[in-house]
């Protein structure tokens, strides 16, 4: 049990069935074992496991209703901060909520930490960096601020959900990407790079799984699909809508390569695919810093198609050996259990 008795958590949803944010509920369920009292102010309540020391308060956070959201959240949060007096606040991906109460937590001398793992240097992040006790992130390069207040503790992946698969029949034909269909994820780059690789390896097949995060990103996704008409007609490209997170292990197990074009923070899906035993073809520098890249030349590290070519040149024995090594790194640095341990150390 932590030396801190009462923790207040901000998150977007308490719903273990949410296709994107179910992990927020999972984190709460782990933290209740370490604190005498856990209170969560959340944006939406769904299905979650109840505990005698857990209280959940619904602020009814609705996307697009910014002013109303802020008022409802403050109406719930401020009286609780004054009367409930938690000893520490953990804000899980909720930079706006942290911003809204940052001055109050500062004046009330309540320790306040924000989980933030993005490259974007938003106004809210900069404000929170000034008034909060710390910013918690996955890797040093996954937060745009360099400061003693930044704590890198890895990603939080339940390794039991991603067992290492049998690689004896690995064919390196089916490529998959799972993630938001947003411009930052570089779907168009992924498609063009696979098209280049197909000139040497025509058996390659690509599946992109995910949905746009908002109406603006939907325009981008629709344009990508229209521009990919020839690839769709040729039968080597497939688009699929987002799936529940519970289906991710099965999808990863049914493919040969995870391909990824995001140049920012360390995506959790990269860790999940690594745990399963998929080779990761990516230009993400945060991933390469921890796991390396396929190919020794800088040019190869920055080219998805050249990484595919390098992968194809490896013997199965050498490939499997490297994939096992990468899984060991992922378990050591990014398991949910160790993430919780490191988080509690920071919060205390």
Model-derived features: positions:
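Glycosyltransferase donor-sugar binding loop
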Residues: 45-46, 178, 205-222
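Donor nucleotide-sugar binding/catalytic pocket of nucleotide-sugar-dependent glycosyltransferases
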Residues: 26, 55-58, 119-122, 129-164
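Acidic donor-binding loop of glycosyltransferase active sites
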Residues: 250-265, 278
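Conserved donor-binding/catalytic core segment of Leloir-type glycosyltransferases
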Residues: 8-10, 168-185, 190-198, 206-209
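N-terminal subdomain of nucleotide-sugar transferases
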Residues: 1-46, 337
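Nucleotide-activated donor-binding/catalytic signature segment of Leloir-type glycosyltransferases, i.e.
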Residues: 221-242
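A charged, aromatic-enriched C-terminal amphipathic alpha-helix characteristic of glycosyltransferases
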Residues: 302-303, 313-348
